[in-house]
Each structure stands twice: as structure tokens, then as C-alpha cells.
Amino acid sequence: MDRFAAWVERYLVAWDSNDPDDIAALFSEDALYFTLPTREPWRGRKTIVREWLDRKDESGDWWAFKYEVIARDGDLGIVRGVTEYATDEGAFVENLWEVTLDDEDRAIRFVEWWIQR
């Protein structure tokens, strides 16, 4: 498993647990988290944890996340995924993530592109 797939696996743990420590472990101290590329990012680990928890999916809300790391260029990885939600029958979200990692494999920049089908 490469460093980007390992990061996504840790993201999935945090997504399911909503544990502040799991979330914080994903991001550098001064990370940027873009919930959409055109929105202002959440700035810094503490803000990311707070905003994540304010908007969290409850454990069990999403049923499955299938993904593939489709590109790598140094510290930048591109992840394509599909989220299937358990709460809405047939609710699927297509995801494209830009993940830039530091030397400790924490995200310094995370950008979500998504669309519901």
C-alpha cells in the first residue's frame, strides 16, 4: 500500500469514528482543507477538526467508500472514489480528492471535488 492509499485508509477510520484524535492525525498543523475547490478552506488542524465535527456524517450514515489512487506526483496524490450512503437508498457521491502530504504523511492541503448522482 502506498502512502496515499494509507492516508485514505486513515481518513476512512476518522470518517467512521469522528474521533478528534483520528481527524487531527490526518493533517499538518497549518493544513488547508477545501470542502470544494471554490470555497474558502478550513485553515489549520484545530479548525479542520472543529469544522469536521460540526458537519460530520454519523457512523453508519455511509455504507461504503470505494476508491483508487489514480495519480501520484511527488507529494501530490489524486484519489477517485465513490461513496454510497446507507441513509438514502441509492445515494451515491462521486469524489475526486487532491491530497498533498508532508514528510510525515499528514495532509498539508486537501481538496474535495464531489457530485451526487
Regions found by a protein language model. Name each.
Residues 3, 50-117:
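A beta-strand edge to alpha-helix "cap/lid" segment located at domain peripheries
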Residues 1, 12, 20, 36-39, ...:
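Short, charged low-complexity linear motifs
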